[in-house]
């Protein structure tokens, strides 16, 4: 059983997430975060990860979208946890909550967007084509099919538009 609980972060709670945001994205101002969080809640939602004492250890933002290849998806734009355990029980708790919510909303897949650092290389031939057009490799997108989802060729990674 996890020591963490996952909670919906309503408009009265989103400002509590800002210290986590600031740690990961130091250039984001408090007002930028509040504006983004308000928009994220209108388009989907924001979940918080709380420890046993109520301390916030992470969050994720999500939206429900339609994908040509995957159908109805639960798109996670930001998932951030601060934990010392390599087993990442906080991340696991957030992912389990996201999956339950996705199933509840009738989604066939979850797309998880993460920064590209450590996952993708700018030097690939496909990436260079986009880089030469002024784009940068910003993120990769991982996809998890939910039971009853559509078939996808798992040999081709699902990456951001910058990958091509």
Regions found by a protein language model. Give the residues of each.
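Conserved catalytic-core motifs of GNAT/GCN5-like acyltransferases
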Residues: 113-114, 132-149
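Conserved acetyl-CoA binding element of GNAT-fold acetyltransferases
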Residues: 71-83, 140
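Short amphipathic alpha-helix that is part of the acyltransferase structural core
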Residues: 1-30, 156-161
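A short helix-loop-beta-strand connector motif used in the catalytic cores of GNAT acetyltransferases and
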Residues: 38-48
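Conserved beta-strand-loop-alpha-helix junction that forms the acyl-donor binding cleft
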Residues: 111-126
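Conserved beta-strand in the GNAT
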Residues: 48, 55-64, 75
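A short, aromatic/hydrophobic, helix- or strand-capping loop or linear motif
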Residues: 28-38
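Conserved acetyl-CoA-binding loop-helix of GNAT-fold acetyltransferases
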Residues: 81, 86-100
């Amino acid at each position: 059983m996890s020591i963490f609980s996952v909670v919906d972060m309503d408009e009265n709670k989103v400002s509590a997430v800002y210290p986590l945001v600031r740690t990961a994205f130091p250039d984001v101002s408090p007002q930028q975060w509040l504006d983004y969080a308000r928009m994220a809640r209108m388009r989907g939602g924001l979940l918080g990860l709380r420890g046993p004492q109520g301390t916030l250890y992470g969050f994720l933002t999500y939206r429900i979208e339609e994908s040509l290849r995957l159908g109805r998806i639960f798109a996670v734009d930001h998932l951030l946890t601060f934990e010392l355990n390599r087993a990442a029980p906080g991340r696991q708790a957030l992912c389990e909550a996201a999956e339950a919510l996705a199933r509840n909303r009738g989604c066939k897949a979850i797309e998880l967007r993460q920064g590209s650092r450590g996952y993708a290389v700018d030097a690939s031939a496909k990436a260079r084509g986009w880089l030469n057009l002024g784009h940068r490799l910003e993120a990769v997108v991982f996809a998890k099919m939910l039971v009853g989802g559509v078939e996808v060729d798992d040999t081709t990674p699902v990456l951001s538009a910058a990958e091509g």
